[in-house]
């Protein structure tokens, strides 16, 4: 069982920097805390909007520090580590109908909707859960050097996990309800 628990405290046994590419293989070590030592996450924080072709997609990105990833299995030693993450929430409206909205919810599931910014990579990457279609997909978020501030949110086409039985997805609908293929989003807050 893999969990992310914000409130549970276990001792930090070592610390690595998410900015230091040489330490990237040490981030997952038991008891490690992978910290955002260079404030790389700041550039992504805010409310971002995509509004085209009858689709309004709002993406709220917030920082969450020291999120625990804990793995427990009967008969094995508990393994855990901490990460500084970006947490994603979203509202999806299609043809003026709200399809999904958790923008203002307080419950946070960091394992479902998150991103990390590692090293000198020009993007943050992680997973997002399309709650309408019940599919978890990998994504990248690239900050553009523009005014107004913009990002490219790219929900990957080929890296996903279907949560429902495969028969659920044979309804002639696209696999994801969230827009895909590198959409440009503008910062509105």
Predicted regions and their residues:
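Amphipathic/hydrophobic helical signal segments and adjacent flexible N-terminal regions
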Residues: 1-45, 49-54, 66-83, 152-189
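Central antiparallel beta-sheet cores of small beta-barrel/beta-sandwich binding domains
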Residues: 59-146, 189
